[in-house]
């Protein structure tokens, strides 16, 4: 990435850098979200489904009955047959309204935190931060972004989890029903488990991304020193950045998926759900996040915490890669423009 020439105390440079981070973050988030929306819809359908996806997964008798979705391929076919191609982008508008400000805030706050920790606004200096500081910076940036965009995340989950016939035909109808049934606080239903999830997720995602980038840079230097007769540069190529983002997204998702399942259950509890798509999560079904984890373990088994793990991981890997690569390229392009 092309580093900024501003110092920590250079206010005009700080403003320019913040605008670049915010713009590049919003664009990268929007691109990544639009590309991976079908996988996100499939993932959410599994996560909010109380019934077991397999017969051996049945733990408690009162959850018997056929599951709507039993596998990723079957779910893809069902959604396409019943809802058409557009079904894979259900809830994409609130998702974009959530993701774009989320990534905008996240990358802006992340750069400020790393600048403070390293004493420099130069991006090339941030890569040398310790894994601990990279993790903490990512976690705090994720929390700030979550607080700033959460209502749209809630609406995205609600709209993506419903099928046909629709319970909520528009984002406005879902918003009105939440306000009427839960009040303003309802727009932040599930915020606590979301923050609990985002701390390790964002921390791991950014921490491992920086770690993978350092490894790639070391590998490039090694190839240069060994004088291998190929064109080698210590700067990372777009493919190498893609691989780093791929690894970061996959690692974070595999570790934090159970927390995401509980978060989704909190977000839809007490809301209307067509019987065709299985049992609904009753209001106040879980007292807190630990109780949610415990109840899912008791009623659905350990694999209940990993419902939707396949589409979730398949989505997280390219989503992380596309987000980081799009951010790096957009940031470089904006840096090259005369302001």
Curated annotation (Swiss-Prot):
According to the lineage, what is the superkingdom? Eukaryota
Q: What does this chain do?
A: Mitochondrial transporter that mediates uptake of thiamine diphosphate (ThDP) into mitochondria.
Q: Which residues fall in a coiled-coil region?
A: none
Query: Pfam families per the record?
Result: Mito_carr
Any transmembrane segments, and where? 16-32, 93-110, 132-155, 187-204, 236-252, 308-327
Main location as per UniProt: mitochondrion
Its GO biological process annotations read: thiamine pyrophosphate transmembrane transport
- What's in the keyword line of the UniProt record? Membrane, Mitochondrion, Mitochondrion inner membrane, Repeat, Transmembrane, Transmembrane helix, Transport
Keyword Repeat assigned to the entry: answer is: yes
Instruction: Provide the protein name.
Output: Mitochondrial thiamine diphosphate carrier 2
Stated family = Belongs to the mitochondrial carrier (TC 2.A.29) family.
Q: Which GO terms describe its molecular function?
A: thiamine pyrophosphate transmembrane transporter activity
Q: Name one GO cellular component term.
A: mitochondrion
Map the Solcar repeats onto residue numbers.
16-116, 129-215, 236-333
Task: Give the membrane topology.
Answer: Multi-pass membrane protein
Lineage, top ranks: Eukaryota, Viridiplantae, Streptophyta, Embryophyta, Tracheophyta
């Amino acid at each position: 990435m092309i580093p900024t020439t501003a110092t920590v105390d250079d206010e005009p440079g700080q403003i320019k850098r913040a605008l670049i981070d915010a713009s590049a973050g919003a664009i990268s988030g929007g691109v990544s979200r639009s590309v991976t929306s079908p996988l996100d819809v499939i993932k959410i359908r599994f996560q909010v489904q109380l019934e077991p996806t397999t017969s051996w997964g049945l733990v408690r008798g009162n959850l018997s009955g056929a599951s709507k979705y039993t596998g990723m391929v079957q779910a893809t076919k069902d959604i396409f047959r019943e809802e058409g191609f557009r079904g894979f982008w259900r809830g994409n508008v609130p998702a974009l309204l959530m993701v774009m400000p989320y990534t905008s805030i996240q990358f802006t706050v992340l750069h400020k935190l790393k600048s403070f920790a390293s004493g420099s606004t130069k991006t090339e200096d941030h890569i040398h931060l310790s894994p601990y500081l990279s993790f903490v910076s990512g976690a705090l940036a994720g929390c700030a972004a979550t607080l700033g965009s959460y209502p749209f995340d809630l609406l995205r989950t609600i709209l993506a989890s419903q099928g046909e016939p629709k319970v909520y035909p528009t984002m406005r109808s879902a918003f009105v029903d939440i306000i009427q049934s839960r009040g303003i606080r309802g727009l932040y239903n599930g915020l606590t488990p979301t923050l609990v999830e985002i701390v390790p997720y964002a921390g791991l995602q950014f921490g491992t991304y920086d770690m993978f980038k350092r490894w790639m840079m070391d590998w490039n230097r090694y190839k240069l020193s060994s004088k291998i007769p190929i064109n080698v540069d210590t700067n990372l190529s777009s493919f190498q950045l893609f691989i780093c983002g791929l690894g970061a997204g996959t690692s974070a998702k595999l570790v934090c998926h159970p927390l995401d399942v509980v978060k989704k259950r909190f977000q839809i509890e007490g809301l209307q759900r067509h019987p065709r798509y299985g049992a609904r999560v009753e209001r106040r079904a879980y007292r807190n996040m630990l109780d949610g984890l415990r109840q899912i373990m008791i009623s659905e088994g350990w694999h209940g915490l990993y419902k939707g793990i396949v589409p979730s991981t398949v989505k997280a890997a390219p989503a992380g890669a596309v987000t980081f690569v799009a951010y790096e390229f957009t940031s470089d392009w904006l840096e090259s423009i005369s302001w």
